[in-house]
């Protein structure tokens, strides 16, 4: 198989292939390229604006006319626009035991939205790998790169890693999420990571880092 920048293969680790590279890759089918083109387009972003408009108004205090438009939206690592989108192929490698891909955390503060399209193999009978959402028990508290300790949050919901399932959320200072531990498996955890981000940060979690 073609090595797409992966030089150090590790167990239960995420590896990504972004839209800018995939769209120029002759080994990627036209079907997938069309999928990527649509999910990095302003048309898709505009649909998300409409779906989440009330939440956007509540969290960010702006209406749709103040959000990025077709003229200033581009593809990340390709266009360097005011607002950049991406649609990444992502795999989490097989695991030999109960391990977690990532604990509760916040995404990049530049990110405005994220959509996870799960592509679980039909033959994959392993457990875990589900998306979790969380709420702080008290005041926000982070360590490292926007990580959150398990004892600082309560579980809100567990969204099963399932074939053809799409999970979408707005990124905010309270959008804490993680992934449940995966049991031993030879299967990859596969999904498309669809995001939109600004060139600037939307919030700052650093004042809440552990001292």
Give residue ranges: language-model regions:
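Catalytic core of non-heme Fe(II) oxygenases with the double-stranded beta-helix
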Residues: 29-37, 45-208
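Non-heme Fe(II)-dependent double-stranded beta-helix
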Residues: 1-40
């Amino acid at each position: 198989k073609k090595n797409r920048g992966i030089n150090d293969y590790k167990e239960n680790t995420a590896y990504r292939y972004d839209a800018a590279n995939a769209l120029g890759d002759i080994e990627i089918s036209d079907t997938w390229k069309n999928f990527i083109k649509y999910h990095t387009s302003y048309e898709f972003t505009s649909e998300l604006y409409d779906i989440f408009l009330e939440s956007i108004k509540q969290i960010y205090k702006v209406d749709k006319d103040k959000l990025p438009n077709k003229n200033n939206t581009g593809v990340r690592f390709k266009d360097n626009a005011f607002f950049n989108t991406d649609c990444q192929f992502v795999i989490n490698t097989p695991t030999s035991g109960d391990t977690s891909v990532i604990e509760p955390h916040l995404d990049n503060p530049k990110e405005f939205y994220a959509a996870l399209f799960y592509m679980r193999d039909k033959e994959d009978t392993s457990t875990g790998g589900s998306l979790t959402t969380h709420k702080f028990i008290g005041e926000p508290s982070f360590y490292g790169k926007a990580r959150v300790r398990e004892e600082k949050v309560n579980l809100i919901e567990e969204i099963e890693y399932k074939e053809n399932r799409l999970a979408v959320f707005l990124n905010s200072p309270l959008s804490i999420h993680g992934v449940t531990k995966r049991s031993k498996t030879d299967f990859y955890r596969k999904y498309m990571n669809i995001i939109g981000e600004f060139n600037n940060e939307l919030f700052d979690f650093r004042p809440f880092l552990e001292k």
